[in-house]
Swiss-Prot record:
Xref: Pfam families: Ribosomal_L2, Ribosomal_L2_C
Listed InterPro entries: NA-bd_OB-fold, Rib_uL2_dom2, Ribosomal_uL2, Ribosomal_uL2_arc_euk, Ribosomal_uL2_C, Ribosomal_uL2_CS, Ribosomal_uL2_dom3, Ribosomal_uL2_RNA-bd_dom
Location in the cell: Cytoplasm
Family stated for the protein in its record: Belongs to the universal ribosomal protein uL2 family.
One of the protein's GO biological processes: cytoplasmic translation
PROSITE patterns, A to Z: RIBOSOMAL_L2
Annotated signal peptide: none
Key words of the record: Cytoplasm, Ribonucleoprotein, Ribosomal protein, RNA-binding, rRNA-binding
Region annotated Disordered, chain positions: 210-231
Name of the protein this chain belongs to: Large ribosomal subunit protein uL2
GO CC terms, sorted: cytosolic large ribosomal subunit
Gene name linked to the record: RpL8
Length: 257
């Protein structure tokens, strides 16, 4: 009988879970309170820091507590153009400037927004990776809904009361720089999770992977498997509707002409 394959081991967690010990904290918007619902609250950017394992930088923003004589520290995902010492305004009556947090219903059509709430009060769920942004497409004042275009290109209808940060997430173009050597890849994934180096199944022994073994590296059987396949065999193209090249596309048409 073969061994427990890599996919089964990853499903159990253990050494494959994310490394969060050195993370700076969970970057979120402020908790929705009376000040944000009816006016605005002012904060100041104290520092912009690097979060290990995250491509986007984080901004440390200090707010005065509206009810107690104390300062509240918040961690925001830094948009492009934010700087230390900048004043950040959060609330319904905030102005449309980079770094400010306001409801998407108060933003004009075409506004670039990031760290967008999916549900009211969840403190930011969408468009959070480096270089990502969503675009406000249109509003429906009667239904109090706003249509936005997500980084994937999908269009989503959200409540107009959902908050978002104006601007593009900083760190864009990060993946354009080539890694060039294995040492950099090692350090990149060391702070993320145990997923590197990635060994191909055909390069393994038959006891370790269904694609392993043989006098030369080849799968030796159909790589498509059904959805209900047992866990130790469920590798390759899982429940594929079709395989192979997509013929008749733009690239094929250009070659023919």
């Amino acid at each position: 009988m073969g061994r427990v394959i890599r996919a089964q081991r990853k499903g159990a967690g253990s050494v494959f879970v994310s490394h969060t010990k050195k993370r700076k904290g969970a970057p979120k918007l402020r908790s929705l309170d009376y000040a944000e619902r009816h006016g605005y609250i002012k904060g100041v950017v104290k520092d912009i820091i690097h979060d290990p394992g995250r491509g986007a930088p984080l901004a440390v923003v200090h707010f005065r507590d509206p009810y107690k004589f104390k300062t509240r520290k918040e961690l925001f995902i830094a948009p492009e153009g934010l700087y230390t010492g900048q004043f950040v305004y959060c609330g319904k009556k905030a102005t449309l400037e980079v770094g400010n947090v306001m409801p998407v219903g108060a933003m004009p059509e075409g506004t670039i927004v990031c760290n967008l709430e999916e549900k009211m009060g969840d403190r930011g769920r969408l468009a959070r990776a480096s270089g990502n942004f969503a675009t406000v497409i249109g509003h429906n004042p009667d239904a109090k809904r706003t249509r936005v275009k997500l980084p994937s290109g999908a269009k989503k209808v959200l409540p107009s009361s959902n908050r978002g940060m104006v601007g593009i997430v900083a760190g864009g173009g990060r993946i354009d720089k080539p890694i060039l050597k294995a040492g950099r890849a090692y350090h990149k994934y060391k702070v993320k999770r145990n997923c590197w180096p990635y060994v191909r199944g055909v390069a393994m022994n038959p006891v370790e992977h269904p694609h392993g073994g043989g006098n030369h590296q080849h799968i030796g059987k159909a790589s498509t498997v059904k959805r209900g396949t047992s866990a130790g065999r469920k590798v390759g193209l899982i429940a594929a509707r079709r395989t192979g090249r997509i013929r008749g596309g733009k690239t094929d048409t250009k070659k023919e002409t």
